[in-house]
Amino acid sequence: MTDAFSSSSEAVLQRSVTSTHSFHPSGDLLLLYQTPETCRFITSNHFKKVALQFPDELLPDAVRVSAEIEDKTKAKTYILGDTSYGSCCVDEVAAEHVGADCIVHYGSSCLSPCRRLPLLYVFGKRPIDVHQCASSFKELYPNLQSHIIVLFDVTYSHAIDDLRTLLCDVYPNVVVSRLKTDHSCGAELIQDSCVDLQSNDDGVIFKFGRQFRIKEGQTVNDYSIFYIGQEGLTLTNFMMSWNNCVFSSFNPETSTGRVESVQINKALMKRYYAIERAKDASVVGILVGTLGVANYLIIIEQLKDTIQRAGKKSYMFAMGKINVPKLANFLEIDIYVLVACPENSLLDSSEFYRPVVTPFEMELACNKHREWTGEYVTDFRELLPGGSSHVGFPEPSQSATEEETTDVSLITGALRSCSTNSSEMMHNSETSSLVLRNQTLTVANTNAAASFLAGRSWQGLEPKLGQTPVVKAVKGQRGIAIAYEEEGNEDASTQQKL
């Protein structure tokens, strides 16, 4: 749904906003927002301008937190709201507009890396009953020898140290993840896990800002996963990425644990259907869904190259908040690919007129060397050269001109041709003055935009050059549509005649 990516504009306009003068007591405010640690971060780095980014639910405390930081550090603070793409992402663009030296991001986060400005995460400390969480864990996993990975929402990172103490003495094979960020208040105090993380080997797993180490000879699929937090995008992201694992969760809001019964196979079938739609597409729209995640420009260029190699046409769209009416304006686009942070990449496109896929799904559709194995990637940085899931195109030989393959669409049942052009043809794609002939002496030069135009029932106004008489320009009407200036005079003259 569109709400998974951005808030509904109608809901924002109709929302009732109440003023809260005493949102948190002063003592709780310093503890919740970890003001001493934030001030220490600012003063130790000699920052003079600081951008404070608050999600909507924490904005009532923004003024008090800002005043406290300015009083302790003498630095100038600027309060920022959510980005156009979601509250989990850091708004580096707005911070640069005010000339900030660093950013302090409050609340939940997708932990996507940023490169422009120094960044400090303050996740806050949501309440959680650690003993009840441990009790639910023991009920869900009665076998003390179970291999389990513990993941958590970042807002509960403050309690993971206590939970690890309660579990590791009883469950020797439990692996507790830790946050892996450049700067985060409190995260540095959390120990690695029950299993030592100091060794740098292949057993260390890094995913969505979490890091843990599994035992030698095992994979993540050999473990069950216990997640601490509410049902949401973070949990869905993990379940899609590790779709062969059995998930359980503990909701601190209700203090209840359960085995997750989300039909991941059904969700993967929907995504595979979107991949088939991408294979059938001729014109692809690249949606820019982030301006702050590191390497987003690199993945856009890689997508352009991949789409071009597959014989498709691509256009890039940077339109801020994405909604159905905006995307419906471009009928020529067959499918969209969204470049966003991992938590906002899985956009349910059922409401849109055209499907919206992820960069991983687009590469599956365009790169025949990447095969569907059940592995699912939502972090586009893993698709870049050097990433764990990078699959490049082979370098074309000098004698090769074009390699054509024929495929059958699983949706329409029609034949479709997939061509991988040589580098020379790619660099000369801007001109079609000279084209190569194949062995049957037929010239083939397809254009997706021209094909779409030829298939439309109405192709625009026909110029009919030389067939229409040339006339002088005449004075048009003045005013607004509800009442032009000449209309009033005509009505008055008509009444006089009557």
Curated annotation (Swiss-Prot):
Pfam family, one: Diphthamide_syn
Binding site for [4Fe-4S] cluster: 89, 110, 341
Cofactor(s) named in the record: [4Fe-4S] cluster
Pathway: Protein modification; peptidyl-diphthamide biosynthesis
Record flagged with keyword Transferase: no
Self-association state and partner proteins as the record states: Component of the 2-(3-amino-3-carboxypropyl)histidine synthase complex composed of dph1, dph2, dph3 and a NADH-dependent reductase.
Record-given protein name: 2-(3-amino-3-carboxypropyl)histidine synthase subunit 2
Gene it is expressed from: dph2
